[in-house]
Amino acid sequence: MTEPTYIPLRLHTEFSITDGMVRIKKLIAKAQEYGLPALGISDLMNEFGLVKFYKACRSAGIKPIGAADVRIGNPDAPDKPFRAMLIIRNDAGYLRLSELLTAAYVGKDRNVHHAELNPEWLENGDNSGLICLSGAHYGEVGVNLLNGNEDAARAAALKYAAWFPDAFYLELQRLPERPEWEACVSGSVKLAEELGLPVVATHPTQFMSRDDFNAHEARVCIAGGWVLTDKKRPRDFTPSQFFIPPETMAERFSDLPEALENTVEIAKRCNLHITLGKNFLPLFPTPDGLSLDDYLVKLSNEGLQERMVQLYPDEAERAAKMPEYQERLDFELNIIIQMKFPGYFLIVQDFINWAKTHGCPVGPGRGSGAGSLVAYSLKITDLDPLKYALLFERFLNPERVSMPDFDVDFCQANRGRVIEYVREKYGAEAVSQIVTFGTMSSKAVIRDVGRVLELPFTLCDKLSKLIPLEANKPLGLDDAMKAEPQIQELIEAEEADELITLAKKLEDLTRGLGMHAGGVLIAPGKISDYSPVYQADESASPVSMYDKGDVEDVGLVKFDFLGLRNLTIIEMAQNNIKNTTGDIVDVGTIPLDDQTAYQIFRDANTTAVFQFESTGMKKMLKTAHTTKFEELIAFVSLYRPGPMDNIPDFVARMKGQEFQYIHPLLEGILAPTYGIMVYQEQVMQAAQIIGGYSLGGADLLRRAMGKKKPEEMVKHREIFAEGAAKQGISREKSDEIFNYMEKFAGYGFNKSHAAAYALISYQTAWLKAHYPAEFMAATMSSELDNTDQLKHFYDDCRANGIEFLPPDINESDYRFTPYPDMKIRYALGAIKGTGEAAVESITSARQSGGKFTGLLDFCERVGKEHMNRRTLEALIRGGAFDSIEPNRAMLLANIDLAMNNADQKAANANQGGLFDMMEDAIEPVRLIDAPMWSESEKLAEEKTVIGFYLSGHPFGPYAQEVRQIAPQKLSKLKPQDSVRLAGFVTAVRTMMGKRGKIAFVSLEDLSGQVEIMVGGQTLENCADCLKADQVLIIESKVSRDDYGGGDGLRILANQVMTLQTARERYARSLSLALAPHHDIGELVQLLAAHQLPDTPRIPLQLSYANEKASGRLQVPPKWTVTPSSALFGELETLLGSRSVRVNW
């Protein structure tokens, strides 16, 4: 093989995040095409892509060179750091670069404004494992050369040469578009000759081909928040910065061949080695000098004894059961010790038991770990695996060596405390979370590129929304354009070809950084010895620079600390129960055969019940009539794509329909699921019983079936048939059983996971059945910021007979508060514009000084630090002051006066002396009067901060009236060809369907809400009247929504009328309810103005009421009026909507 002439060293991949769009897979393919024996990448201040690059190079037979393009602090211009490239020479260099990058993000003396290396770190540290390139025109040497300061350039070169003895190169770059760089090249060559330093040529690669330049500019603008036409935006890159072949570099540096030769020399000096496939567990301290093996055995046996007392209180029964449990425990312990995983189990049980004893609720289990009796004995899980036939081999297979993986659910509110405990136990430097990479999906990239191209938002939004979803993920742009022709039509109509061209180039490129939902790394020492650490800002948690797959490859062990909202709900509900009733409830000890709890499932009353909230699940429950826990486990497993097809058969068999097992030998394992394979564990057990597999081997078979690898399936089919033949089973029957297993292995569910989650489902249902107000208050408190969910739960509460008390500054807390007799006080924290700190200041003032007496008193006592004008307005609009002053308009009018008064009193109090003596002489503040809002105004204002109507409903004043012609309640709708509906419009949205424009109208009455489709000619006829915040009467057709699943309804409008139009068409008389405050003279004038000649008129009916009496007034026959929208509107403005009623 000929000696290479040039090795690329400087290259930004997509993992530079703010620039660079080189994808590693394409890079390696092009490097092979160029015949490169070695290749380097140097992402900006990170090593996010290093492991992926390393593995790809090794697979392609290319020597990987790891490096980072680093910023180095510039004390003379802190906002303009210098640049250099640090290349890994050996293992020491790998650790050193990781250490430096970690210090730049999480070190105590880091730059908090942007990540950079402190020059002192380089001066004082051991850099012997690194090679440094000067950074060309961006480096300290190059900047000074371009500024004409040769002395400073010389001093910098000597400084770096001292930091990196025999490993510092002056870097040379040439681009056709950058002739000004030549001064840096010539100056560097001159310095090199003078100081005896080597030079090296690099090409600053940012993208793969020249025609990627515009897309790369768009990528830089997306990251920086600029638009492409902005003349002030940075233009740091040129079209020449693509991945050029060695021949181009040879031409470009033909006058400096040694600069090219040194790229090869550097490649030879570098030997990057990353250890892959070896696990590094943290050291777990054990007492009394016990080994990890002995300590695990000790804790497991002690824990089993404790569990057995709980499971079998009767001593004789416990003694009879103990041998079975002890045998299973010993079996598991032997495998765990044989596979060298005692340390893993001990670490997990330690932080879980710390959480349980420090007020941090932990889930009963998650994933296959619930199948381990050792885990149950150590209190890692809380479900007896023997009782529910859960298999250890599904979790830890002795025939397939891989790390065990406990996914642990913690109460969301306390999860951080457990992670902090781990930090304290193992050291902060040994613990971090895991980075994730956000990419530009097809929908997102359309919006991003559209913004930098300054295209109309409506166009980009429309295009983005046209992209279809598949399995809840948007299709790629190419597939989307094939599936949805409207995309291409819209692009052509709007001349948006450039948008699609750039979007396709950027699609799926790494765009941003995130944090893995639950993964926590614990290392045997510093995390940075295995992966550099990144931290977005002061408030963020440190994360590894390697993602989940990469950290596992380098041997770091991931522990999953997942936050589960439902555990927080259960904990809050238990506290609520204690506060309201005095009962001490521990859902971990409730019986699993409580039929009151199962009635919740039978009634499909499962809103807020974990895993059973969806419409489709409720539909299944209505037909199932479940009575036992095993059925809940099956439902959790069945209600998913694929297994859902078996639900009708499963339910029918539950109810007594006869069925046959596929083979009598499988009756024992299939009986709990009525002959249907539901769980992965059943596939494994069938392989064991029929095919003679060990459970470990059966797990390998299950995995092979799931992956559908033909060559493996042929092999396993023969093994299975041989085992079946030993049982006297024919080849035809064994193939039938094998095919049946293969079908279910593809989508069978992990029973251990289903059982653990079914337990949480049952616990939440039990709480809802026995303590509904306490449970629902906790549920709503977990969703304070989610208005849609709060409305959903509010409606469910009302349907279950729970009464809501309004928010009240003298009664409410931050969260929802349950009261005896099925009442819940609305939470101040659920009012938009408040916050926990603001509410804390209210409750604190209330506790120390008693109830508030008015707005002035409130403002004087509640600290201004957290109670700003916006928060005060929100509380007033939400009705939180109604108990001390029901006139919300008047309170709003006096906010400035009240806050200024509070400020003045605080200032006077600080002065003391004379002001104290004058306090009594100061004239009291008088509040400004203001007319009360009408009912509709009050509700509209209330909705802006509550999110829905709480103290009333805008449909209320009209309900009795419109029920005369539209008696159907929305909550009681059933399929029917024609029905007249009435309600208040809360929202209208439109979209383009295949047959044209469609409007979706959200309609509410006092019983519930529906969505009505309006299209075609009907939409054309009523387009002007489809607006929110009005009453509509709609002639509709109601049918079953088979497409949507569950028992949803599809409602199609045939005719739409506003209330005013309906009144004009159907009114027979007009009733007006008068009160002392009404202006009768103005009323008479108004009515007279609507006695139009030559028009149909309707008679008036008047009533009058004051504090002493009420009665009907006789109206002369001549007082008839012409019904019209104008008349009804004016009357409602004058008298109020509740005083005007049309009789139909």
UniProtKB/Swiss-Prot annotation:
InterPro entries: DNA_pol3_alpha_NTPase_dom (IPR011708), DNA_pol3_alpha_thumb_dom (IPR041931), DNA_pol3_finger (IPR040982), DNA_pol_IIIA_C (IPR048472), DnaE2/DnaE/PolC (IPR004805), DNAPol_HHH (IPR029460), NA-bd_OB-fold (IPR012340), NA-bd_OB_tRNA (IPR004365). NCBIfam families: polc, PRK05673.1. One of its GO terms (molecular function) is nucleic acid binding. The lineage of its organism: Bacteria, Pseudomonadati, Pseudomonadota, Betaproteobacteria, Neisseriales. One of its GO terms (cellular component) is cytoplasm. The gene is dnaE. Belongs to the DNA polymerase type-C family. DnaE subfamily. One of its GO terms (biological process) is DNA replication. CDD domains: DnaE_OBF, PHP_PolIIIA_DnaE1. It catalyses: DNA(n) + a 2'-deoxyribonucleoside 5'-triphosphate = DNA(n+1) + diphosphate. PANTHER family: DNA POLYMERASE III SUBUNIT ALPHA (PTHR32294:SF0). Keywords: Cytoplasm, DNA replication, DNA-directed DNA polymerase, Nucleotidyltransferase, Transferase. It is found in: Cytoplasm. DNA polymerase III is a complex, multichain enzyme responsible for most of the replicative synthesis in bacteria. This DNA polymerase also exhibits 3' to 5' exonuclease activity. The alpha chain is the DNA polymerase. SMART domains: POLIIIAc (SM00481). Its EC number is 2.7.7.7. DNA polymerase III contains a core (composed of alpha, epsilon and theta chains) that associates with a tau subunit. This core dimerizes to form the PolIII' complex. PolIII' associates with the gamma complex (composed of gamma, delta, delta', psi and chi chains) and with the beta chain to form the complete DNA polymerase III complex. It is an enzyme of class 2 (transferase). This is DNA polymerase III subunit alpha. It comes from the Bacteria.
